[in-house]
Regions:
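Charge-dense, helix-prone N-terminal extensions
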Residues: 1-207
Length: 207
């Protein structure tokens, strides 16, 4: 695992697999994008280092955000992103059962440019949250069935069949995502966004 510096990470990779220091390392696919995100985080006075083989940004010793590189995208991950107000809904949980962290995914420099104003707002919030010393306490996990899902099933039998063919964990990931919105209109939009994954047999945010 690379534990030297963020510059070494961008040059050689994370060192967590056999592709370290080779063109096959996923980090090398996203160097330009990661550099833009890195500069954005440093611009607001965060301290930079490596944790778990990836760039980590802190304030007063508290973790604020990390950068990550994957096959299909790169991400900025907020450690307690669930505590932030995401008016533009650009954050997603990194996994179906994630209760604290939230990530923003990018697949190009242009996409970063489009989302950057909203990302900056999230970064400022994350810094303020870290400085406050507060610890985010997630709501108890309650699987509340969203009525908007039933409404869609009533008019789309194929979608209903596909959903009920999913594993319980994948079903739950969609339920939690949809039901997590407070407004009915937002829940309806989330149902629509989940349709392609449901039909493909995937859970929410599953790659």
């Amino acid at each position: 695992m690379n534990t030297t510096s963020v510059d070494a990470y961008l040059q050689d990779g994370c060192g967590r697999c056999e592709h370290y220091q080779s063109p096959l390392c996923k980090v090398h696919r996203w160097v330009d994008e990661l550099q833009v995100l890195r500069a954005t985080l440093l611009m607001v006075g965060l301290d930079e280092g490596l944790k778990w083989g990836a760039p980590c940004f802190t304030i007063q010793g508290r973790n604020v955000a990390m950068l990550g590189a994957y096959r299909h995208d790169c991400v900025i991950s907020f450690f307690e992103g669930a505590a932030l107000v995401d008016d533009h809904e650009i954050m997603v949980p990194p996994g179906p059962n994630s209760r604290y962290a939230r990530v923003v995914r990018f697949s190009s420099v242009d996409e970063i440019a489009q989302k950057l104003p909203h990302v900056r707002v999230l970064i400022v919030q994350a810094i303020e949250h870290a400085r406050s010393g507060d610890r985010f306490v997630p709501d108890p996990v309650v699987d509340t069935w969203p009525p908007e899902l039933d409404k869609r099933f009533a008019t789309d039998e194929a979608l209903s069949r596909a959903f009920h063919a999913l594993t319980p964990g994948r079903q739950r990931s969609h339920i939690l995502h949809i039901a997590g919105a407070k407004q009915a209109s937002t829940r309806e939009r989330r149902v629509t966004r989940c349709v392609p994954d449901i039909l493909a047999g995937k859970g929410f945010n599953e790659r």
